[in-house]
């Protein structure tokens, strides 16, 4: 502890005003603002109490890469996309290879697409490779926001194009 006039002062902390106080501060892992309660106690002195706040900001992230995805021809360009297929980075945290839990993201409109002459992307349900992946992703966890987007955006539509002709493919269905 600290000392005042040679008297040792012991600081203890809790995440509840009427909770158990310990010498270790409370541990918070999710983004949000938290109140920490403290007590300063010393022999022959009245305890002093107070609070301070701890704020954990959401981690700003950007899409870094998408793993290979292949499916068997079913006449549709629709793709099942899961969080484990995506890798993110954060300029703010100077971190790469960030993997999000499945509970942190949801997807819609995930489709294999092909770039057209005008630069647009259209669904591409035919067999073969050389495709791009178009999708909308929504963050379902308050622990993340998309970096570089206004006001902590939690939904973005993206086209992930690659020079790897085998990254996104549709294979022929087995003959009946």
Question: Where are the regions that the model predicts?
Answer:
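Short loop/turn motifs that initiate or flank beta-strands
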Residues: 1-176
């Amino acid at each position: 502890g600290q000392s005042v006039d040679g008297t040792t002062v012991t600081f203890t902390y809790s995440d509840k005003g009427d909770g158990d106080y310990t010498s270790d501060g409370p541990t918070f892992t999710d983004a949000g603002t938290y109140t920490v309660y403290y007590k300063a106690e010393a022999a022959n002195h009245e305890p002093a109490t107070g609070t301070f706040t701890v704020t954990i900001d959401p981690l700003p992230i950007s899409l870094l890469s998408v793993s290979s995805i292949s499916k068997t021809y079913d006449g549709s360009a629709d793709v099942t996309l899961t969080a484990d297929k995506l890798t993110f980075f954060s300029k703010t945290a100077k971190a790469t290879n960030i993997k999000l839990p499945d509970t942190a993201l949801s997807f819609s409109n995930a489709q294999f697409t092909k770039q057209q002459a005008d630069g647009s992307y259209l669904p591409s349900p035919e067999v073969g490779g050389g495709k791009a992946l178009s999708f909308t992703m929504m963050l379902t966890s308050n622990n993340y926001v998309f970096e570089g987007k206004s006001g902590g955006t939690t939904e973005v539509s993206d086209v992930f194009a690659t020079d790897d002709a085998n990254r996104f493919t549709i294979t022929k269905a087995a003959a009946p």
